């Protein structure tokens, strides 16, 4: 998939880049798989902002994605590759032999006309197929990995994401994530073969504020540009620094301070991700 550049007929247009849509099939989405999600724009049930820098963004419909991949024993044909406004990868429309249609994440290399299937074991190792981790060969690249059997894929779903199956130990398998983290996942969990497509997304330049507004992202004001009443970094004459380590508007350390709470799943992480 190619990166598009644009002629600079306005100053903001000069630095914008986008993705070519040549891989997208020119046909409407399946209406039964579209749903309107409520817009919260970072507000809670009282209307108060609980998550800053969010807004509604452009109008869009949510595509119902099959993350579980538990339609065993029935082959499906890729009918279309579509754009999904709620995620940065493409989605593939699968038409199964029993007449049902479902959307799945498009792995790299999957195109219109290909045949995909899901089963507990015994499938070819090719992009788009899904099996239980215990039956996938060591060394295979996977995505859309479950953390609890039957719950549906929760990990490795964004554009260009992947993990490699490194080994098997009793009821667990070992995955190496793109970040370098090594972690155990239950061998009964499902995973899809291949790397998530649209890997060029990481090279796209937003280019102007308006594109982020369309995505539902509002501007972020620096704490040092505020008054002392609004932020611990506020106040002072000119561009004076705050004189303290960086903190959030509520005084908690940020910019490098560890904030992750200990969780029960920590024991499944063999080695942490590598710092960049």
From Swiss-Prot:
This is Large ribosomal subunit protein uL2. One of the primary rRNA binding proteins. Required for association of the 30S and 50S subunits to form the 70S ribosome, for tRNA binding and peptide bond formation. It has been suggested to have peptidyltransferase activity; this is somewhat controversial. Makes several contacts with the 16S rRNA in the 70S ribosome. One of its GO terms (cellular component) is large ribosomal subunit. Keywords: Ribonucleoprotein, Ribosomal protein, RNA-binding, rRNA-binding. NCBIfam families: rplB_bact. The keyword Kinase does not apply. Residues 230-240 have a biased composition (Basic and acidic residues).
């Amino acid at each position: 998939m190619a990166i598009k550049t644009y002629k600079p007929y306005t100053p903001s247009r000069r630095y914008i880049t986008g993705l070519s849509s040549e891989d997208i099939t020119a046909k409407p989405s399946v209406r039964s798989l579209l749903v309107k999600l409520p817009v919260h724009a970072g507000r809670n049930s009282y209307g108060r902002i609980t998550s800053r820098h969010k807004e509604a963004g452009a109008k869009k419909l949510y595509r119902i994605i099959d993350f579980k991949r538990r339609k065993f024993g029935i082959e499906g044909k890729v009918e279309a590759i579509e754009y999904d406004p709620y995620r940065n990868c493409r989605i593939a429309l699968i038409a199964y032999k029993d007449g049902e249609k479902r959307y799945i994440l498009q792995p790299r290399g999957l195109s219109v006309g290909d045949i995909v299937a899901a089963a507990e074991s015994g499938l070819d190792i090719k992009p788009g197929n899904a099996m239980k981790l215990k039956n996938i060969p060591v060394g295979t690249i996977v995505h859309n990995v479950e953390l609890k059997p039957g719950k549906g894929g929760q990990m490795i779903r964004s554009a260009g994401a992947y993990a490699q199956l490194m080994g098997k130990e009793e009821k667990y398998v070992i995955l190496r994530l793109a970040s370098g983290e090594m972690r155990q996942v239950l061998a009964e969990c499902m995973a899809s073969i291949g790397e998530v497509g649209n890997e060029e997304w990481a090279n796209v330049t937003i280019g102007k504020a308006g594109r982020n507004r369309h995505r539902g992202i509002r501007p972020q004001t620096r704490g040092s540009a505020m008054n002392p009443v609004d932020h611990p970094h506020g106040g002072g004459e000119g561009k004076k620094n705050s004189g303290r380590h960086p903190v959030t508007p509520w005084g908690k350390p940020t910019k490098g301070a560890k904030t992750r709470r200990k969780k029960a799943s920590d024991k499944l992480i063999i080695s942490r991700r590598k710092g960049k």
